[in-house]
Amino acid sequence: MAAAAAGAAGLMAPASAACSSGSAGAAPGSQGVLIGDRLYSGVLITLENCLLPDDKLRFTPSMSSGLDVDTETGLRVVGCELIQAAGILLRLPQVAMATGQVLFQRFFYTKSFVKHSMEHVSMACVHLASKIEEAPRRIRDVINVFHRLRHLREKKKPVPLVLDQEYVNLKNQIIKAERRVLKELGFCVHVKHPHKIIVMYLQVLECERNQHLVQTAWNYMNDSLRTDVFVRFQPESIACACIYLAARTLEIPLPNRPHWFLLFGATEEEIQEICFKILQLYTRKKVDLTHLESEVEKRKHAIEEAKARAKGLLPGTAPGLDSAAGFSPAPKLESPKEGKGGKPSPPSGKSAKRKMEGPKKAQGHSPVNGLLKGQESRSQSRSREQSYSRSPSRSASPKRRKSDSGSTSGGSKSQSRSRSRSDSPPRQVHRGAPYKGSEVRGSRKSKDCKYLTQKPHKSRSRSSSRSRSRSRERTDNSGKYKKKSHYYRDQRRERSRSYERTGHRYERDHPGHSRHRR
């Protein structure tokens, strides 16, 4: 039977790895199928190329996972015995049980016992073989049978399986294992059994009436399913070896000049090797499944530890990178601004709030801002430091800078006033009475107490005409303020520029409204 599948040019399908090459070499047509001017990948599936080459038989995937030969052979024997016992309880025909065991042997020559559960694959092979041989069984029955076999093997009282979440998970695992078997075998699940061949050969030898000989040869053939002879030799050679072994056991003479099996295409070397493999089963000790499962678990843990050690997850092992710096960037010693110009970096939100609250509390509790000269200089230096650390959005607008520079109060005064203006919080505008020195002095304390409770001003932007009028007012009143005492001048410097300017402006423009009515 040949099948061609479309795919990449010149590539072999990976699913044919389990049955791609046999003793006769590569099958013709496996290099591809030429359709028109394109070459499509081809898979030639025959009963001859289902045999495994010697290199796969000598070094199996289980050996690469760390299992020794005896442990792997014991697992193969136990798995085939489970399939045979489950088939008997499920009342499957012998052909279906033989198909399940052959599929089991083929699968574990492509996969490891360490990575795949032997019991789950056995259940999947029984369920798959029952459908292949047209004697299907429900997967629930297969699970119940294997559950009973496990309790009998452990010498426990059989208990019905509870239909809980564990049962659902087991059912899903068996379905996945069945799909995995089909994928690894390339859906080449047809098995040619030697049962009918034995009867046909005995008819040729005129020994079909000897029921004892027929039954003994049949028994040897069923026992040979636990070995690897079905993946190494043709069914005709296996049938001849079973007849030869049964005749030698029952001491029934058969033609030997020439040997009778040469008529059916078998060789003497193949007959001897098959007989040796079958007789080895009867000399082996009874397999302890618990010991085999413990060996498999040890190999699993060893592989997991090796993987974790390679990734650096275990304590005392170094990760793939030398240090944690490979996962996160190293901390910077200084900010970019400090490295470039030596200027301090802008403070964080909490530190900026603390710096703002300090001057506010001092101004709110001091009567008429009557601070000493040392305290005045400290507050001025603090306001300057805060104005330097402010972001550009909090500084004065260009128009206000222009008006400050145009004033006659001097460059140093305007510079200090602009800095203190940027640091002062916004105020709500109130309309007051015309300016009177005595009233301002008397009500200054009440104004400072109300300062913290006032709502912020909605907008800081003012028109250029207002700034020009303010500058004119400052120049007109400069002479008037100079006549006052130095004590009042120091107080005026300490107060924020915006507060005094807004008070003068609205008190002069709107004489009918006063902030403190009497």
Curated annotation (Swiss-Prot):
Assembly behavior: Interacts with CDK11A, CDK11B, CDK12, CDK13 and POLR2A, the hyperphosphorylated C-terminal domain (CTD) of RNA polymerase II. May form a ternary complex with CDK11B and casein kinase II (CKII). Interacts with pre-mRNA-splicing factors, including at least SRSF1, SRSF2 and SRSF7/SLU7.
Keyword Transcription regulation: yes
CDD domains linked to this entry: CYCLIN_CCNL2_rpt1, CYCLIN_CCNL2_rpt2
Biased composition (Basic and acidic residues): 438-450, 470-479, 487-512
Region called Cyclin-like 1, residue ranges: 81-183
Modified residues (Phosphoserine): S328, S335, S345, S348, S366
SS bonds (residue pairs): none
Domain remark in the UniProt entry: Contains a RS region (arginine-serine dipeptide repeat) within the C-terminal domain which is the hallmark of the SR family of splicing factors. This region probably plays a role in protein-protein interactions.
Ranges where the record places region Disordered: 310-518
Residue ranges, annotated region (Cyclin-like 2): 196-280
Tissue/organ expression: Widely expressed (at protein level).
Compositional bias ranges of the Low complexity kind: 405-427
UniProt lineage: Eukaryota, Metazoa, Chordata, Craniata, Vertebrata
Family: Belongs to the cyclin family. Cyclin L subfamily.
GO cellular component: cyclin-dependent protein kinase holoenzyme complex; nuclear speck; nucleus
Alphabetized SUPFAM superfamilies for the sequence: Cyclin-like (SSF47954)
UniProt function note: Involved in pre-mRNA splicing. May induce cell death, possibly by acting on the transcription and RNA processing of apoptosis-related factors.
PANTHER family listed in its UniProt record: CYCLIN
Region feature (RS): 382-420
Protein name: Cyclin-L2
Biased composition (Basic residues): 455-469
GO biological process: regulation of apoptotic process; regulation of cell cycle; regulation of centrosome cycle; regulation of RNA splicing; regulation of transcription by RNA polymerase II
Xref: InterPro entries: Cyclin-like_dom (IPR013763), Cyclin-like_sf (IPR036915), Cyclin/Ssn8 (IPR043198), Cyclin_C-dom (IPR004367), Cyclin_N (IPR006671)
